[in-house]
């Protein structure tokens, strides 16, 4: 009997520890859910009184309540994943993730809002408020999430970390490659997914049949020569937002690529499931959601592939030789 009780006790203790751990994580995510909801609503209050009043939006894919639930869950999941997979801790982690989150979720998206919608549905006053809207979730929620998830203490990392360490020449050609890749994904997804929607073409002032791809591209370069340089700038901002994630990641490059892909695609596009007077046509929102979620996810994964370490040769880059 004594032997049985000795072998049984560790199993019971392990089971109890597992139950305690489960409820601890449930309580943590419940707290994070509540905090993000409150701060998201606080940020949204910046738009009070400046949204278009003469534009009626078509209904979203889901109700406002369900949409808010989805937005909160998606953002909490992505931010928590970035925090928990980082080798960093304390303010280094909080500031790094906060800046990356604001840059990728608010800044890089709203400069595109300025470029395309400032002459359609977005006033200069509203544009400023859109930039302010993202501040609470980035610079208040992220540090709080670091604390709630138990990463508030700085821990010195003595393990080797080759992420982002490469010669200047390699940085130059990789950033050039990243820019070309982003232009290809942006323009390809934009034309073959979003631009095939006649309601979207009409919304942006080009009703009727779509032009063939190369004619459409040439016409865009002729009439809007700033578009491609502007998108190259956005590509570099995307990369800047990915650097703290790549450098701080303690998981393997495949998982890091998945995380950055989700980070680039989920928080920015989940809002398209709701009604939106800035994009009042439901099919336009859906087209943009599919277009940008697909292209930015792929782009995020490629950024990690190119930048996570130095590559000695093209074979090394393609995984055909040992690093």
Name the predicted role of every residue range.
Residues 1-15:
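N-terminal amphipathic/basic-hydrophobic helices that include classical n-h-c signal peptides
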Residues 12-321:
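Juxtamembrane/disordered regions of integral membrane proteins
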């Amino acid at each position: 009997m004594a032997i049985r009780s000795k072998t049984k006790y560790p199993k019971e203790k392990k089971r109890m520890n597992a139950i305690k751990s489960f409820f601890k994580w449930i309580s943590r995510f419940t707290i994070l859910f509540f905090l993000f909801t409150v701060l998201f609503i606080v940020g949204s209050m910046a738009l009070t009184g400046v949204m278009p009043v003469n534009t009626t939006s078509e209904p979203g894919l889901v109700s406002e309540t369900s949409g808010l639930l989805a937005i909160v869950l998606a953002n909490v999941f992505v931010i928590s994943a970035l925090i928990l997979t980082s080798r960093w801790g304390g303010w280094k982690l909080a500031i790094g993730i906060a800046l990356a989150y604001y840059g990728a979720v608010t800044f890089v998206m709203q400069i595109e809002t300025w470029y395309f919608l400032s002459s359609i549905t977005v006033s200069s006053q509203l544009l400023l408020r859109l930039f302010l809207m993202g501040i609470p979730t980035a610079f208040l929620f992220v540090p709080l999430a670091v604390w709630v998830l138990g990463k508030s203490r700085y821990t010195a990392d003595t393990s080797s970390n080759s992420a982002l360490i490469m010669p200047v020449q390699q940085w130059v050609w990789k950033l050039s490659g990243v820019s070309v890749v982003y232009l290809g994904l942006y323009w390809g997804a934009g034309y073959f997914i979003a631009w095939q929607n006649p309601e979207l073409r009409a919304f942006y002032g080009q009703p009727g049949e779509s032009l063939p791809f190369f004619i459409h591209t040439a016409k865009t370069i002729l009439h809007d020569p700033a578009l491609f340089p502007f998108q190259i700038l956005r590509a570099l901002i995307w990369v800047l937002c990915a650097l703290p994630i790549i450098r701080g990641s303690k998981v393997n490059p495949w998982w890091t690529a998945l995380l950055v892909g989700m980070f680039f695609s989920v928080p920015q596009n989940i809002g398209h499931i709701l009604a939106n007077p800035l994009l009042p046509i439901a099919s336009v929102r859906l087209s943009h959601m599919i277009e940008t979620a697909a292209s930015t996810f792929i782009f995020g994964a490629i950024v990690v592939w190119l930048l996570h370490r130095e590559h000695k040769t093209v074979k090394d880059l393609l995984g055909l030789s040992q690093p």
